[in-house]
From Swiss-Prot:
The active site is at C287 (nucleophile). Pathway: Polyol metabolism; myo-inositol degradation into acetyl-CoA; acetyl-CoA from myo-inositol: step 7/7. GO terms for biological process: inositol catabolic process; thymine catabolic process; valine catabolic process. InterPro entries: Ald_DH/histidinol_DH, Ald_DH_C, Ald_DH_CS_CYS, Ald_DH_N, Aldehyde_DH_dom, MeMal-semiAld_DH, MSDH_GmP_bac. It comes from the Bacteria. Catalyzes the oxidation of malonate semialdehyde (MSA) and methylmalonate semialdehyde (MMSA) into acetyl-CoA and propanoyl-CoA, respectively. Is involved in a myo-inositol catabolic pathway. Bicarbonate, and not CO2, is the end-product of the enzymatic reaction. This is Malonate-semialdehyde dehydrogenase. Belongs to the aldehyde dehydrogenase family. IolA subfamily. Keywords: NAD, Oxidoreductase.
Amino acid sequence: MANLATGEKLKNFIGGQWVESDSGKTEAVPNPATGEILAHVPISNREDLDRAVSVAKEAFKTWGKTPVPRRARVLFKYQQLLVENWEELARLVTLENGKSYKEAYGEVQRGIECVEFAAGAPSLMMGKQLPDIATNIESGMYRYPIGVVGGITPFNFPMMVPCWMFPLAIACGNTFVLKPSERTPLLANRLAELFTEAGLPEGVLNIVHGAHDVVNGLLEHPDVKAISFVGSQPVAEYVYKTASQHGKRVQALAGAKNHSIVMPDADLDGAVNQIVNAAYGSAGERCMAAAVVVAVGEVAEPLMEKLQKAVNEITIGNGLDDDVFLGPVIRESHKQKTENYIELGEKEGATLVRDGRKDNVSKDGYFLGPTLFDNVTTEMTIWKEEIFAPVLSVVRVESLDEAIQLTNQSEFANGACLYTTNGSSVRKFREEIDAGMLGINLGVPAPMAFFPFSGWKNSFYGDLHANGTDGVEFYTRKKMITARW
């Protein structure tokens, strides 16, 4: 593990060994809250990736035939080690990502839950059998692992998203090559250390740090059979098209613009609490963030009054400090991009209720306070595009029909939420909203690991979603056997 006090150079994890990249290139990994250099991550090349894939391919010959209960026992041990190191993992998340320690602690919990699901997944790997499909003939379906799987993960959930991928893939008998975000590489290396301690054989999990060369290498390598990706919409589309053209199974989870509809009969205090947490938690850098509030009818004025008050009370600072809610964004470049969106929102006619650019926290960190817009319309850029930052837009409409129509105009469809006490409104919302994950009176309707993370439209590219039974389907292939006895 890197010495965080000296900014030590990180290494790739290939074949159970920590190895230097052949490229000789590195990139600094700063703490977003302080600018302090935590480590230097290698920007690996194709040769590094080829070595990892070759090792994973060789390891698959044994791991793919390892009895399922034995694989599950390694995962149960891994889960135990993650629990024992919970606080350390949460601190690492905060150091390299910037989110508050409380949120990081919750992220580690979600990652552990993914490992728990993977450890218990053998019951979902069972096949099916039907005797006597004809006289003295029986037929059965069996599941087999697919081989070497590649995973490409983002900076915003350095614990949870990798744990969506490699534990379940490995439980299903595959081997794995992970390319974590070069912005948050520390947590990935620690996950590999703990998995090795749990008894995972060499070569089953490999980590290659880097950027475009490693990504393209995974997408094009003939020995990589499937790709799981989480990231922005343009990159997700590229990953899906490129990997598909090279004959791979692909799931690519993309961007979002999640809408929250607030009805006049809603519990406003509860709605505001949920919306503020969903919009500004993790600095808005998550694909389930609340990005747009749709205020229906006469609820708009009292809702705006309560929202403004709640947003003004948000505490900003280093995520390791007590009582901090909003940490920094990931990099200075992302801060500047977000500030440009805020400026554009003003120019296009939105009402800037609270300007996060005016919050003075620290000149060394990448801090941006919570921003709140009112009177946003669907013609504005800040409504159309994913900002991925602590910016919330409020749109005013007159009816639930109008709110649903507006929400469905978005090219993204990860999630949507409704705040109401009326069952008829819930039923209408549930049936008519074109999005994959819906919340009723809660702000982040992300499912547990045993359900699929089911984005729609331009929020997802592929057929089988991450997690749940979809995940098992994605990481296995079926073989039909028909026999006469």
